[in-house]
Amino acid sequence: MLDQVCQLARNAGDAIMQVYDGAKPMDVVSKADNSPVTAADIAAHTVIMDGLRTLTPDIPVLSEEDPPGWEVRQHWQRYWLVDPLDGTKEFIKRNGEFTVNIALIDHGKPILGVVYAPVMNVMYSAAEGKAWKEECGVRKQIQVRDARPPLVVISRSHADAELKEYLQQLGEHQTTSIGSSLKFCLVAEGQAQLYPRFGPTNIWDTAAGHAVAAAAGAHVHDWQGKPLDYTPRESFLNPGFRVSIY
């Protein structure tokens, strides 16, 4: 099933690129929480929803662009968790650092994940405890890698005082910044060793990247040391967390 989901992410990426390249208007509007949404978000959402309903008609889907109410999903044990375009701010800035995120959740755990970066044409995927990166048609297994001093990857668009204080206390390290779920993927492929997050994220922002990072050997825990959990709950918000090889 992983190959079909990867192809679905690629198809969604193609729909996004039609807007990114100017073939279709971007049509940026603000949602109720003031976050931006574009025609590309909606186009990718439609591609993924149609594809997953065909691939697995019995598994419900939770997408950022059309999340079902709590009464609908409160008893879900297995479901798809989708962000059709993660990094909309990066998309609008046209820096290429946005992704398509698709994860399969089973009893609160992301057991399959796909993160596709359309501009870079790079696909990260994970299933059955293994993670891969596909680039230029070549797919290879990836895993975390230690480095001293560690490289800490941080958000391109979301900095905060807590993060600044944490980095000051961390000891010797280097930092790099990148948008979207690519932060998880940098840790997964051994380029970075730590991704700390204090600011707000939603479950669709993290599930696919979580699957990839965990399958590559990283720990994805909240600041109390518990793994991020995707068991249905009324709020879509995650607690703060860290993705770490340590």
UniProtKB/Swiss-Prot annotation:
Record key words, sorted: Cell inner membrane, Cell membrane, Hydrolase, Magnesium, Membrane, Metal-binding
Cofactor: Mg(2+)
Reaction equations catalysed: adenosine 3',5'-bisphosphate + H2O = AMP + phosphate
Membrane topology: Peripheral membrane protein
Annotated substrate binding sites: E64, L85, D86, G87, T88, D205
Database matches in CDD domains: CysQ
GO biological process: 3'-phosphoadenosine 5'-phosphosulfate metabolic process; phosphatidylinositol phosphate biosynthetic process; sulfate assimilation
EC id: 3.1.3.7
Residues binding Mg(2+) 2, per UniProt: D83, D86, D205
Domain of life according to the entry: Bacteria
Family label: Belongs to the inositol monophosphatase superfamily. CysQ family.
Record protein name field: 3'(2'),5'-bisphosphate nucleotidase CysQ
Lineage of the organism: Bacteria, Pseudomonadati, Pseudomonadota, Gammaproteobacteria, Enterobacterales
